From Swiss-Prot:
<dbReference type="GO" id="GO:0000724">
    <property type="term" value="P:double-strand break repair via homologous recombination"/>
</dbReference>
<dbReference type="GO" id="GO:0043248">
    <property type="term" value="P:proteasome assembly"/>
</dbReference>
<comment type="subunit">
    <text>Part of the 26S proteasome.</text>
</comment>
<comment type="function">
    <text>Subunit of the 26S proteasome which plays a role in ubiquitin-dependent proteolysis.</text>
</comment>
<feature type="compositionally biased region" description="Acidic residues">
    <location>
        <begin position="30"/>
        <end position="40"/>
    </location>
</feature>
<keyword id="KW-0647">Proteasome</keyword>
<dbReference type="GO" id="GO:0006406">
    <property type="term" value="P:mRNA export from nucleus"/>
</dbReference>
<dbReference type="GO" id="GO:0008541">
    <property type="term" value="C:proteasome regulatory particle, lid subcomplex"/>
</dbReference>
<dbReference type="InterPro" id="IPR007834">
    <property type="entry name" value="DSS1_SEM1"/>
</dbReference>
<dbReference type="GO" id="GO:0000502">
    <property type="term" value="C:proteasome complex"/>
</dbReference>
<feature type="region of interest" description="Disordered">
    <location>
        <begin position="30"/>
        <end position="62"/>
    </location>
</feature>
<dbReference type="Pfam" id="PF05160">
    <property type="entry name" value="DSS1_SEM1"/>
</dbReference>
<comment type="similarity">
    <text>Belongs to the DSS1/SEM1 family.</text>
</comment>
<feature type="compositionally biased region" description="Acidic residues">
    <location>
        <begin position="47"/>
        <end position="57"/>
    </location>
</feature>
<protein>
    <recommendedName>
        <fullName>Probable 26S proteasome complex subunit sem1</fullName>
    </recommendedName>
</protein>
Length: 76
């Protein structure tokens, strides 16, 4: 080794402290029976077919239309 070369010593690796913690795995899945029994009528709808077509003649709709019309006549 020459005078200009310096010896580089590798640093000791720092190992993270490992705690002796017991890992409790709660990954067990509970199995449930199927809700659909054989031969059962499955025609029951989850949602109403007309869920987005509410009554357009209810009180709220009438008040809303009147308010919109009054604001549109004010701007004109």
């Amino acid at each position: 080794m020459t005078k200009t070369e310096t010896k580089v010593e590798p640093k000791a690796e720092v190992k993270p402290k490992e705690d002796n913690v017991e890992v409790i795995e709660d990954d067990e899945f509970e199995e449930f029976e199927d809700n659909m029994a054989e031969g059962e009528d499955n025609s029951k709808e989850q949602w109403e077919d007309d869920w987005d077509t509410d009554k357009i003649d209810d009180d709220f709709s009438k008040q809303l239309r009147a308010e919109i019309e009054s604001h549109s006549t004010m701007k004109s």
